[in-house]
């Protein structure tokens, strides 16, 4: 499940060399601006925290925290003012629309900062939960692609699409690490 339908552009990764203190990933929805939950759970917070209240969450502007069914907490930050579609206490599923990508809080352009924390509050790499790699680049949700598509393989910027018949042909002729025929 990806945060945005269509193309998801990672503009800043989780704790990469350029920003080792960055506890999340920054994503831009190139085709769709609606932010979707990547996991089910209960909305623990939906709103904004003022700078005067103290704490660092004021930097996130409008944000939604999902207390996941798996014990993790999922944060979707910098949402547009007036765009929140959920409220605290509401149960959500993966795919539920939460709000719209925005530029609220400490932000220098419209994007969504996405963070995942474990049960102890420790930030963990959120890229896999968002269906992207922890690397700057553009990633596409292939779930809406041809049902015959099996998987994508990306190597050195080259993208190869393998369909189910391709994979079945390889499986049929695979023999101890060597292809036959």
Describe the function of each predicted region.
Residues 2-6, 154:
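Boundary/junction segments of secreted and surface-exposed precursor proteins
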Residues 9-39, 48:
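Short glycine/threonine/proline-enriched tight-turn/helix- or strand-capping micro-motif at secondary-structure
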Residues 10, 41, 95-98:
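Residue-level preference for non-acidic, small/hydrophobic
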Residues 20-23, 38-88, 110-115:
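Zn2+-dependent peptidoglycan hydrolase active-site motif and core
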Residues 30, 36, 87-93:
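Residue-level recognition of short, solvent-exposed, well-ordered loop/turn junctions
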Residues 55-67, 90-143:
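Conserved, short, structured surface segments that act as functional micro-motifs
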Residues 70-71, 120, 156-158:
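Acidic/polar residues in short coil/turn loops that connect beta-strands
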Residues 144-181:
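Short, surface-exposed polybasic-aromatic patches that bind anionic ligands, especially phosphate groups
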């Amino acid at each position: 499940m990806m945060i945005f339908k269509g193309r998801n552009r990672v503009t800043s990764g989780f704790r990469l060399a350029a920003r080792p203190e960055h506890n999340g990933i920054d994503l831009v929805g190139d085709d769709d601006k609606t932010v979707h939950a990547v996991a089910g759970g209960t909305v623990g917070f939906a709103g904004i925290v003022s700078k005067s209240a103290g704490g660092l969450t004021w930097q996130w502007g409008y944000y939604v925290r999902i207390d996941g069914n798996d014990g993790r907490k999922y944060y979707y930050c910098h949402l547009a003012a007036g765009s929140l579609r959920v409220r605290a206490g509401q149960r959500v599923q993966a795919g539920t629309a939460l709000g719209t990508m925005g530029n609220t809080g400490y932000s220098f352009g419209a994007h969504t900062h996405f963070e995942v924390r474990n049960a102890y509050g420790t930030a963990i790499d959120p890229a896999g939960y968002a269906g992207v790699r922890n690397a700057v680049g553009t990633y596409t949700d292939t779930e809406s692609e041809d049902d015959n598509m099996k998987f994508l393989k990306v190597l050195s910027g080259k993208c190869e699409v393998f369909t189910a018949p391709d994979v079945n042909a390889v499986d049929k002729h695979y023999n101890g690490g060597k292809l036959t025929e």
